[in-house]
A protein has these predicted regions:
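Well-ordered mid-protein domain cores that form the structural environment of catalytic cofactors
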Residues: 1-40
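Extended C-terminal regions of large enzymes
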Residues: 34-583
Length: 583
């Protein structure tokens, strides 16, 4: 059992024995390593789930930042408990004055809240528009109720003041409801990010369940844990506080064990298997009898404790739930009923769920969700969709970006595919590839729109290139960055072709579960009230997208010509050697 130490100040790398850490959770592991090194050390560690090679496991750093998709099991298979990194030098900046100017410009004119929502969720004196679904939730009368020194009001936060940007997003209340307000200490987030999207709560009662009273997370990890209760979580003192308390218990356990939820699919799979009688069918009678299903029905948080322990330590047949959706479908013979069940939200028969798919700009989100090998983790399009601006403005922006207002459909009022939607899909995918490459957050970027009426709510899509030049000193345009992103995305596609050993991406990879087409049977496709898709239209959509990318229009795999255009001649040669290039 080893720890990898990297001390960047001396560019020193060493492997150290970690026997004394094996069996510990991610939190205790991090604390021990920081005692041995420095409080400034950043530790990425696995918990018991990774040690036990649980497929749905991850590595955790900074308490709750998860690298999922089985990375924990990979580290565990190598007996690698943690990677510890310490650095003392600053980041080299070619033009600090320009960097500061761009930062001020972004902070005062462009940036919104989480997901770059640019209007508040409630009507406010400074705002022309509001949208109750916006994550710009700051308002008068909404407080960080458990803040040190007393409650702090979020208040009205008009754009322009950099020091108040961090108040705009209030994820604990957004994710968990009003009952979370009195337990919220503050919002936090990734290092140096002005958008504070991470909940930080303090709930003394949580200690009764053997976990720290403090903690937090964001998005699905914030609220998913109590969704397994068929009758909802049991309240303690106040209405809906069971959801808040139960989820803090759940996320503290989940992150400490180093489990990964597959964007909530683990919990949906549990609900499916419980409600459909699968567990009763596949679990040995003795195991089924010892599980406290009465606690589940009662919404008792103790059930979560037992459930997560079983998953992380691979106890019994139930623990195979954490093998992933594809594996349990095979192991437990779940069949088409499972894959076609709309509430289960499985996008692909490979076992990953929707992530802003058909419900997010129709064919655009659908294409995006077909392109990766797990939930797609692409927010370029959903940030634009959820900005909070009125439909008329969004369609105007879409015309400027993609050539036609028809690129942008009203949610659940879709139209057939067109060329502008294909450009929208390509833009969404290339931007996420770019952001991943230059380490920008695709949960905020790109700056497509702005909160300022004086800018007519237009953002600045060249900002990535401007920052790139200021930081590196290298001449850069957005067109060059887009080309680099296209190279990255095409390389990813080529690698998928190689790993799957097939050119036929359309029929072997870009697959969609049946419920996406069969839901809402009483509502015709392309009429108001449904976000279902049409099979023929999606076939045409993929063909058009393949052509736009320079891939084979029938197979959906990169051509030699496109690989050469992108400077990937070696990749073309490798694919050709394996008979994986189209004729």
């Amino acid at each position: 059992m080893m720890i990898s130490y990297q001390e960047l100040v001396r560019t020193f790398l060493s492997l150290e024995k970690a026997d004394f850490l094996w069996g510990k959770g991610t939190r205790a592991t991090t604390e021990e390593i920081c005692r041995l090194t420095s409080p400034e050390t950043c530790v990425a560690a696995i918990g018991q789930a990774g040690e036990n090679l649980v497929p749905l496991s991850g590595m955790l750093n900074s308490r709750n930042h998860s690298g999922g998709a089985g990375t924990g099991a990979i580290m565990g298979s190598k007996n690698l408990k943690a990677i510890a990194v310490e650095g003392t030098k600053g980041v080299n900046i070619a033009d600090r004055q320009e960097m500061k100017r761009l930062n001020d410009y972004m902070m005062t004119e462009l940036i919104g809240a989480n997901n770059n929502h640019v209007v508040p969720s409630t009507p406010q004196s400074w705002a022309e528009y509001s949208d109750p679904k916006s994550r710009w939730t700051a308002r008068k009368g909404l407080f960080w109720g458990a803040a040190e020194g007393g409650p702090i009001e979020t208040g009205e936060i008009p754009p322009g003041n950099q020091n108040t940007v961090g108040f705009r997003t209030y994820k604990s209340v957004f994710d968990l409801g009003p009952a979370a307000e009195k337990y919220t200490v503050k919002m936090s987030g990734c290092h140096s990010c002005p958008i504070r999207c991470m909940t930080q709560m303090n709930i003394p009662r949580v200690k009764e369940f053997g976990v720290p009273s403090t903690g937090g997370n964001t998005c699905v990890a914030n609220f998913v844990h109590t969704t397994i209760f068929p009758n909802g979580p049991k309240d303690f003192e106040d209405k809906d506080d069971g959801r808040v308390i139960g989820n803090l218990v759940g996320l503290n356990l989940f992150d400490d064990y180093g489990l990964w939820c597959n964007y909530g699919q683990l919990h949906r799979d549990f609900t499916y298997c419980y409600s459909k009688g699968v567990f009763k069918r596949v679990l040995p009678a003795e195991e089924y009898a010892e599980i406290r299903w009465d606690q589940l029905e009662a919404g008792d948080v103790n059930f979560i404790k037992d459930f997560y322990y079983r998953l992380a330590h691979r106890v019994g047949e139930l623990s195979h739930l954490a093998d992933g959706s594809y594996a349990i479908a095979e192991r437990w013979n779940l069949g088409e009923e499972y894959w076609g069940y709309a509430k289960n939200k499985l996008w692909s028969p490979f076992g990953y769920p929707v992530h802003h798919a058909n419900e997010a700009s129709a064919q655009v989100g659908s294409i995006v969700n077909c392109m990766f090998n797990r939930d797609c983790m692409t927010h370029t399009h959903i940030n634009f969709i959820g900005s909070g601006l009125p439909l008329k403005l969004q369609r105007e922006v879409a015309k400027e970006l993609f050539g036609s207002e028809d690129a942008y459909d009203e949610t659940k009022n879709y139209t057939p595919i067109n060329d502008a939607k294909i450009k929208y899909a390509k833009w969404s995918l290339l931007r996420v590839c770019l952001h991943n490459a230059v380490t920008l957050c695709n949960w905020v970027w790109p700056m497509t729109v702005s909160p300022l009426k004086s800018r007519n709510y237009r953002g600045d899509l060249a900002l990535e290139a401007k920052f790139f030049k200021a930081i590196t000193g290298e001449e850069m345009t957005q067109e060059k960055l887009d080309l680099a992103a296209e190279r990255i995305f095409t390389l990813h596609r080529a690698y998928t072709v190689k790993l799957m050993q097939t050119k036929d991406m359309r029929n072997e990879h870009d697959l969609i579960c049946s419920w996406v087409f069969d839901k809402d049977p009483q509502i015709p496709v392309f009429t108001e009230g449904t976000d279902k898709m049409d099979r023929d239209d999606m076939h045409a959509s993929l063909t058009m997208f393949y052509k736009e990318m320079g891939w084979d229009p029938q197979l959906g795999c990169p051509t030699r010509e496109t690989l050469q255009r992108l400077g990937l001649e070696d990749i073309a040669a490798d694919l050709a050697a394996h008979n994986l290039l189209p004729a």
